Amino acid sequence: MERMIPIVFVAVAVSVGASAQGGRSAPPPLPLEPGASQADVDKALLAAPAALRDQATVIKWKSDFTYDTLRKGTNGLVCYDRSGYPLQQPFSVQCTSAANLSREAQNLKAEASGDRSKSEAMLKALEQDGTRAKPAFGSVWYHLSGPDRDHVSPHQMTVAVPGATEASLGLPEKRRETGAWIMNAGTSTAHIMIPGR
């Protein structure tokens, strides 16, 4: 009987601990795909909010604008490294909804020339002829970039609102440091800028 009391006490303590966490603990990080590098996965995940990180998918873009999956996730968020790509900072990681990967592939293809005016012209042409992939309305893009990992700008979040305008959202179209604003209003690129995080 003396041995049973400590076991019951431990079982009750574990049960109470689980209840305090909403009845379940956070799932462990997902396994990597064969051949994937933990360092590559960890770097891409730096852009993700901590609460979404362990269950996010991580991909690696290829030169043909397709990608390899380094880790399959379960929460719909996809993270990737854009460091050193044309028109990107030397350190640049990003996460967004899996629904936005076709759009990101178009972005990378347009930026491949390394010429900002050519890139913008290509994306504008896609917008005008109706072939520009639209982001999922309300989807979030998480960005972290800078000259190196130790000198990044504050996290930025943008929320895709394709077609939205100042009139439809009630947000200003002019940049402001103290709050959200809408950029590229009225286009498929329209998004809410949220400085800092």
Describe the residue ranges of each PLM region:
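Positively charged n-region of N-terminal signal peptides that target proteins for export
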Residues: 1-4
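Sec/Tat signal peptide C-region and signal peptidase I cleavage site
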Residues: 16-20
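Primary mode marks residue(s) on the alpha4-beta5-alpha5 output face of response regulator receiver
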Residues: 23-197
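Bacterial N-terminal signal peptides
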Residues: 7-15
